A protein has these predicted regions:
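Alpha-helical recognition segments enriched in aromatics with Gly/Pro capping
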Residues: 1-145
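Structural preference for alpha-helix termini/caps and helix-kink/transition segments
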Residues: 90-287
């Protein structure tokens, strides 16, 4: 409880005229919206004392119950090696970055790429690198989805994706080590890329299911498209046939037709099929 100050809101209380302090504000908000015991309470490393200790003391005194089951205290974020500051011109909000055209999934990736107990140095260059990673994940997913429709491979092999998923789960269970889990995910995607041409239809379907499962964990929105539209596949078949007979004028028109539907053609290497990939939505500043 803070003593009243001039030109500030205040109320009468047994402790004199004043207002709630920010420690009690947080306890009150938690109890109102999350209940008397919070599953996970996060905050910056600078809030351990006195803020979080005060939250615990006053909340548990009021309810007689544990205030939070798990605490996650994150290191502070650096931008280009320095603390964020408006005066230095290195202060970014999420909306700022989105309005500059940066992929929201790339931003998400960068923020998840370092363990929360370690300091992250955020740079615009890291966003570009993260965008390339997201692009590789997208490409692999749509390669699998396309090949199921195109190749019809019945006698190929399968990958042990269950082992990778178990490793990822183990990393997440180790103090929420998302950075390690991401590294395992990327390694698995590289293995899928190596074996793509030799996977059976069942193996490809398992890869698609693996991506869907990883999307539920990491939220990169890779598998939001679960099926390639028939008209896109039909146009792709016409595109492939035009390329076979070296009718490049027609193939260019068909490529543009696919692009107008929000997809892009990915030409395969010699002996490999051409596939399609859904373009990501460009954030326009609206929800």
């Amino acid at each position: 409880w803070k003593a009243a100050k001039e030109n500030e809101p205040s109320w009468d209380s047994p402790w004199g005229k004043g207002r709630p302090g920010w420690h009690i504000e947080c306890s009150a908000m938690c109890m109102r919206h999350l209940g008397e015991t919070v599953d996970i309470h996060a905050g910056g490393e600078d809030l351990v004392f006195p803020h979080h200790e005060n939250e615990i003391a006053q909340s548990e005194a009021a309810t007689g119950k544990p205030f939070a089951r798990y605490w996650l205290h994150a290191r502070h974020l650096l931008v280009n090696g320095e603390k964020m500051s408006k005066s230095k011109g290195n202060f970014f909000t999420l909306r700022d970055l989105l309005q500059k055209g940066y992929d929201p999934m790339a931003i998400r990736y960068v923020l998840m790429s370092v363990h929360y107990r370690q300091q992250l140095n955020f740079t615009l260059e890291s966003l570009k690198e993260a965008r390339e990673v997201i692009e590789k994940l997208d490409n692999c997913y749509f390669q699998c989805l396309s090949r199921i429709r195109i190749a019809g491979q019945k006698n190929g092999g399968e990958l042990n994706l269950g082992a990778s998923a178990a490793e990822i789960g183990k990393a997440l269970g180790d103090d929420l080590n998302i950075a390690k889990a991401l590294a395992i995910f990327q390694k698995t995607v590289s293995e899928i890329n190596v074996h793509l041409a030799h996977l059976s239809e069942t193996g490809l379907s398992a890869c698609v299911e693996f991506f869907e499962r990883m999307d539920r964990i990491f939220g990169f929105d890779i598998s939001s498209v679960r099926e390639i539209p028939s008209d896109v596949m039909r146009t792709l078949s016409e595109y492939v046939e035009a390329r076979k007979v070296k009718d490049f004028a027609t193939s260019d028109q068909l490529r543009k037709a696919i692009a107008e539907k929000g997809w892009q053609v990915k030409d395969g290497r010699p002996g490999e099929p051409s596939t399609v990939k859904k373009n990501r939505r460009v954030w326009d500043g609206k929800k």
